[in-house]
């Protein structure tokens, strides 16, 4: 009887609410907000996910194969953070510039900073050079810390992609260009091969990075960079992620991650946090290389769909730990239950006594690889007569 008195009634529902991701045209969403963006800027693929659950909130051709371009360099950053976690190096490890790095930095086919033999950079400084000017030479300097040669490193990249469930991704080099453009510093194999991926796969990678290595945000939050200030190696760079703080299309709560542009168009990845809710956004394939307006258009489009996602969804507690009365039984939920839900949603639950699990009455939700629908475990305390 005392259990029954202290237990709250758990709101149940046999009917489910549709939780399918929003779909459609991101360009149309942007234009519905008052922009007049030409059809040629329609992205090849976009996705928005909530980071804690991996739930897909917006999906526009998210599995279409596309080149990540310079966003390829995020995988080098991921492997570097893995090595830091394993104790092989630290964010403050000093890396000297070698002749090869200076040669790569002089390759006019690549985004770069000027690397000079005699200079040295910490791992953290190299990450910032990758994040803002998208330095190929900085990428090579990190690669050379982690692998004996580029072919071995590319294998490491692909193994990590497989581990993260990036099923539509293949890397052929760490830079994100045709192999032939890397000259003598390129890998073996097809000289005209390029990396390919999908928006969904890059959401997996960005989710992994931001979740496991939030220090990354310290290196990607700034759109602009002064490298080696006050030294003979000082360089100043203006970045291209216009959704970051202080930029012309700054998005509320944005604090990383990276852009990438290639012959097939303009891409970017972004993470933003509002309240307790953090989202990941990937935009791939806006217009084509050389279209000077495309860098702006990708952010107007991306910001528009991200604004809608934050307006609709939040990550919040949907059930407190405690005792509940369910169908003549008393159950105890040991931990608070959190989920990503529409802001106007009033939680109702489906109770699985066989597996001792509670989940929300929301159907058709989709998740990134490696994630599953959230649930809460419970113990059966008593059957009330």
Predicted features, each with a name:
Residues 3-200, 210:
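Active-site-adjacent loops and short helices of periplasmic peptidoglycan-processing enzymes
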Residues 190-385:
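Domain-terminus/edge residues, biased toward the C-terminal soluble/receptor-binding domains
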């Amino acid at each position: 009887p005392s259990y029954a008195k202290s237990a709250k009634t758990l709101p149940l529902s046999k009917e489910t609410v549709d939780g399918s991701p929003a779909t459609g045209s991101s360009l149309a969403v942007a234009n519905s907000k008052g922009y007049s963006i030409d059809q040629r800027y329609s992205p090849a693929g976009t996705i928005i996910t909530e980071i804690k659950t991996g739930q897909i909130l917006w999906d526009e051709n998210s599995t279409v194969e596309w080149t990540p371009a310079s966003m390829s360099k995020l995988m080098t950053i991921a492997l570097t953070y893995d090595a830091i976690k394993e104790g092989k190096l630290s964010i403050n490890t000093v890396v000297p510039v070698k002749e090869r790095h200076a040669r790569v930095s002089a390759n006019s086919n690549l985004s770069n900073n000027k690397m000079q033999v005699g200079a040295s950079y910490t791992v953290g400084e190299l990450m910032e050079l990758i994040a803002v000017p998208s330095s190929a030479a900085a990428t090579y300097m990190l690669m050379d810390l982690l692998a004996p040669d580029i072919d071995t490193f590319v294998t490491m990249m692909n193994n990590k992609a497989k581990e993260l469930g990036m099923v539509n991704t293949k890397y052929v080099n760490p830079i994100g260009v045709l192999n032939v453009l890397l000259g003598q510093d390129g890998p073996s194999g097809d000289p005209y091969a390029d990396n390919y991926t999908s928006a969904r796969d890059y959401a997996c990678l960005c989710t992994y990075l931001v979740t496991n290595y939030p220090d990354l945000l310290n290196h990607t939050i700034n759109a602009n960079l002064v490298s080696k200030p006050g030294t003979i190696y000082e360089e100043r760079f203006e970045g291209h992620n216009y959704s970051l703080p202080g930029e012309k299309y700054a998005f509320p709560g944005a604090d990383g991650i990276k852009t990438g542009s290639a012959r097939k168009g303009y891409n970017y990845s972004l993470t933003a946090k509002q309240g307790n809710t953090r989202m990941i956004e990937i935009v791939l394939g806006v217009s084509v290389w050389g279209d000077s307006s495309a860098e702006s258009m990708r952010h107007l489009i991306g910001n528009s769909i991200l604004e809608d996602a934050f307006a609709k969804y939040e990550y919040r507690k949907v059930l407190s730990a405690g005792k509940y009365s369910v169908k003549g039984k008393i159950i105890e939920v040991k931990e608070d239950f959190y989920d990503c839900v529409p802001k106007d949603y009033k939680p109702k639950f489906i109770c699985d006594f066989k597996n001792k699990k509670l989940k929300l009455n929301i159907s058709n939700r989709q998740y990134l690889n490696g994630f599953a629908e959230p649930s809460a475990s419970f113990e059966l305390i008593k059957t009330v007569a």
